[in-house]
């Protein structure tokens, strides 16, 4: 779970900005929305954003949870580590394991079937009214901001989004997927025109072949 957001020239309007404050504590909602960090499904389950995580790797008949995520302990040195990404050698071992691991969605299918069977045994009219009643809180803010958000997104495509999207799309050429944010802020603070020279100064340069 994560946002492309401000790191790549966008803002998750009509999505995360609407529902995250309802689904996470405010400070966590703010940080998840603006930091563009990736948070694991296990971390999101622990925080209450999702209701279930199931393993999809089957190793010789044994179900294995995501090996890149800490799931075998909750606390380390006084900090909650459950759901955090492994680092260093542990992360490398996890990536190597996943390359040859067998993917099996049996447990996921089972959980989906449980949800469907639960819904099947409910009055359909009451079910949809209940679902819409929960979603109404998000939709209220979506309706309040959808017009101004649309106009802002159109303008943004000619500025920060243009830079961010191009930086991301040319990663194979430049070796980097983001602009030079320090140079961008420096030129902006000096009041320089947003022109071709400005854009060339902050975008990555083609790597030498």
Each predicted region: which residue ranges?
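A structural signal for hydrophobic residues in beta-strands of small regulatory alpha/beta folds
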Residues: 53-54
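CoA-thioester-processing core
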Residues: 1-33, 45-47, 60-77
């Amino acid at each position: 779970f994560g946002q492309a957001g401000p790191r790549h020239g966008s803002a998750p309007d009509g999505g995360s900005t609407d529902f995250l404050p309802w689904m996470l504590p405010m400070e966590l909602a703010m940080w998840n929305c603006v930091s563009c960090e990736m948070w694991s499904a296990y971390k999101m389950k622990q925080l209450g954003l999702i209701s279930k995580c199931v393993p999809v790797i089957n190793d010789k008949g044994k179900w294995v949870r995501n090996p890149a995520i800490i799931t075998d302990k909750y606390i380390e040195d006084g900090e909650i580590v459950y759901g955090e990404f492994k680092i260093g050698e542990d992360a490398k071992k996890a990536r190597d394991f996943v390359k040859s691991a067998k993917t099996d969605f049996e447990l996921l299918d089972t959980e989906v079937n449980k949800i469907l069977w639960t819904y099947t045994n409910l009055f359909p009219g009451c079910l949809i009214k209940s679902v819409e009643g929960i979603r109404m809180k998000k939709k209220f803010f979506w309706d309040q901001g959808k017009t101004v958000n649309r106009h802002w997104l159109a303008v943004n495509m000619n500025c920060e989004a243009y830079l961010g999207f191009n930086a991301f799309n040319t990663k194979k050429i430049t070796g980097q997927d983001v602009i030079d944010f320090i140079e961008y802020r420096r030129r902006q603070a000096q009041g320089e025109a947003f022109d071709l020279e400005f854009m060339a100064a902050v975008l990555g340069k083609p790597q030498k072949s």
